[in-house]
């Protein structure tokens, strides 16, 4: 009866499959993890070694004597399944020492997303990393770093050679089995990469607090908008009655919305007619905005009180110093001034689009030749044409008059020709009249004596 391994995790997945098929064990459908085949090996094959255990046999230890012929088919998966099982049993003790640490790490391999911030910090310190503060934004980065360190640790363990006793050819064959164990470790590394697909719950968990915060903010905003400040008057007898100003405000409010001041007036007695003469204080609703109406404490006699409703405006400054109280007339004047200013702006800029800030911007023209833009001649031609057509607004009067006179002296061409013909005819007539006249003043010059010339 062949002896089977007590720790089948030494074998690779392919060897486990071949052993199970050789011993007529039905395998599960589809591709399964190595742990599934290890469990099948323990249930069906390792269980066969248990009956001889009470007799004092040690299944974990290697056999005392074994021939080389039995160990030769160890690296080859084939017909010698029984001999291969014996040889693996011989190497079992040594190989389990190597693979104990990865198995223990697999047991300790928890989901990184389930670790708390302190546990994650401890794991990083174990790997020699000095992390900073772990918060919601940096947690993902440290989780990725921890996964990388675990992968590197498993790869370094699989790549480091183990010291072996080189006394005979048997030890060399044991080293061959160690190589197969190394290959099994590589398969486990690939499984760790498959475990990285569990990062999807990271996104879900990161999103859940955001949604909870949003819900809380919306809930708080609804409460802050529902906050109401009420001022109630309780009049007693005709002689006097206590004046109580009850201010009620919601305690739960969003952090960003400014809190309102809660003021409680002191209890004091006031005559009945004084209350009737004074202006009644209505209920003021505290809105979620920064401005609110708060009734100041009333001191002294009500007879000298003026019908002025003080208004305190709270700004966004942490101290929230109240501003100077304003009367109703001043508030009305300010609103009228604002309206007038708005009308003036609309009159000055009628074609400007109205914006909430009152600031309008126009597109900037690009600088020619800047930022490596090519120079285009068309731009310069446009400039020349514009400069030639440019006409100054202010021209001296003398130039304008000269231009008008020049335009008025311009004579049509046919009038010029007519005048030329008239002048020519006049000169011709004058010449003819001079020839017919005997007393010609130029006759002495025309008829020269030839003798004088000789």
Swiss-Prot record:
This is Lamina-associated polypeptide 2, isoforms beta/gamma. CDD domains: LEM_LAP2_LEMD1, LEM_like. The keyword Nucleus applies. The modification Citrulline is found at residue 320. Belongs to the LEM family. Residues 299-371 are annotated as: Binds lamins B. Expressed in many tissues. Most abundant in adult thymus and fetal liver. It comes from Homo sapiens. May help direct the assembly of the nuclear lamina and thereby help maintain the structural organization of the nuclear envelope. Possible receptor for attachment of lamin filaments to the inner nuclear membrane. May be involved in the control of initiation of DNA replication through its interaction with NAKAP95. The chain crosses the membrane at residues 411-434. It comes from the Eukaryota. There is a cross-link at residue 401 (Glycyl lysine isopeptide (Lys-Gly) (interchain with G-Cter in SUMO2)). Keywords: Acetylation, Citrullination, Cytoplasm, DNA-binding, Isopeptide bond, Membrane, Methylation, Nucleus, Pharmaceutical, Phosphoprotein, Signal-anchor, Transmembrane, Transmembrane helix, Ubl conjugation. Residues 435-454 are lumenal. GO terms for molecular function: DNA binding; lamin binding. Residues 5-48 form the LEM-like domain. Residues 138-243 are annotated as: NAKAP95-binding N.
